[in-house]
């Protein structure tokens, strides 16, 4: 059995780590390089960096901070933000990232997933999904350009259909961001994650809702995800990664201790 992964998420604007609630009302948390170094030393299994304004502003993530992070941490990290071509993806990997993640660019051009997988290998290609539950319609809507509330828009994709399509194109991993839970700290969307897990044959990372150590245990036990991504609880030091890992090990979860 592969060890479950604990993954701090760092949303980035102008080289600063920020955090909001339900993808809005962002507050500055701190310096991106310092926080990356801190989480690496704390025992994170990997890090994910989202330049959340890149795609909405037709920009690409800054290679400068990617290179700086590669110099100061010794764990894998994934980078997302406006990566819409093979050349851009290669550049990010060349500057030190282990994986690249695409979200809005994949929605705009699904064949990009296959192109990246064919040239870089599936192990390097992550697809992020931002899903918002519309209670009136009773469906999970896939959002595009979710980093900028003024440009964010719903797509015509149903969540499950998009998950299946992503896999057919050759994605190596999916990060499923449940937007309703984002920053709320009231637990992951176990019901929906469990449903998606049944149709997902590649690694699935849960995102949105972590508030306690029990929430991590629940998402591993009930949704059988491969990794749990979180931001607020780590940034605010509500949960320390080494303490979380010790708790999970005592509960029988296979996890790496650093």
Swiss-Prot record:
It is found in: Cytoplasm. InterPro entries: Aldolase_TIM (IPR013785), His_biosynth (IPR006062), HisF (IPR004651), IGPS_HisA/HisF (IPR050064), RibuloseP-bd_barrel (IPR011060). It catalyses: 5-[(5-phospho-1-deoxy-D-ribulos-1-ylimino)methylamino]-1-(5-phospho-beta-D-ribosyl)imidazole-4-carboxamide + L-glutamine = D-erythro-1-(imidazol-4-yl)glycerol 3-phosphate + 5-amino-1-(5-phospho-beta-D-ribosyl)imidazole-4-carboxamide + L-glutamate + H(+). Keywords: Amino-acid biosynthesis, Cytoplasm, Histidine biosynthesis, Lyase. Gene3D superfamilies: Aldolase class I. The active site is at 11, 130. It holds the Pfam family His_biosynth. Its main location: cytoplasm. PANTHER family: IMIDAZOLE GLYCEROL PHOSPHATE SYNTHASE HISHF, IMIDAZOLE GLYCEROL PHOSPHATE SYNTHASE SUBUNIT HISF/H IGP SYNTHASE SUBUNIT HISF/H. IGPS catalyzes the conversion of PRFAR and glutamine to IGP, AICAR and glutamate. The HisF subunit catalyzes the cyclization activity that produces IGP and AICAR from PRFAR using the ammonia provided by the HisH subunit. Heterodimer of HisH and HisF. This is Imidazole glycerol phosphate synthase subunit HisF. It comes from Blochmanniella floridana.
């Amino acid at each position: 059995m592969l060890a479950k992964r604990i993954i701090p998420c760092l949303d980035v604007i102008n080289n600063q780590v920020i955090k909001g609630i339900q993808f809005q009302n962002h507050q500055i948390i701190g310096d991106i390089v310092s926080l990356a170094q801190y989480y690496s030393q704390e025992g994170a299994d990997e890090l994910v960096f989202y330049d959340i304004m890149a795609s909405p502003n037709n920009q690409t993530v800054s290679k400068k901070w990617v290179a700086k992070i590669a110099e100061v941490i010794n764990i894998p990290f994934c980078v997302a933000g406006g990566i819409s071509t093979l050349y851009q993806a290669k550049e990010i990997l060349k500057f030190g990232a282990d994986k690249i993640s695409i979200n809005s660019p994949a929605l705009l051009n699904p064949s990009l997933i296959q192109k990246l997988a064919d040239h870089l290998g599936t192990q390097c290609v992550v697809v992020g999904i931002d899903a918002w539950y519309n209670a009136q319609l009773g469906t999970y809507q896939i959002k595009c350009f979710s980093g900028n509330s003024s440009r964010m828009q719903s797509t015509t994709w149903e969540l499950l259909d998009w998950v299946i399509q992503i896999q057919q194109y050759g994605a190596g991993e999916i990060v499923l961001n449940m937007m309703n839970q984002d920053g709320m700290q009231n637990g992951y969307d176990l019901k929906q994650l469990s449903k998606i897990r049944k149709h997902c044959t590649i690694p699935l990372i849960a995102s949105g809702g972590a508030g306690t150590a029990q929430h991590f245990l629940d998402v591993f036990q009930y949704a059988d995800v491969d990794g749990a991504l979180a931001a607020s609880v780590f940034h605010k030091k509500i949960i320390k990664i080494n303490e979380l890992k010790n708790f999970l090990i005592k509960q029988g979860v296979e996890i790496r201790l650093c």
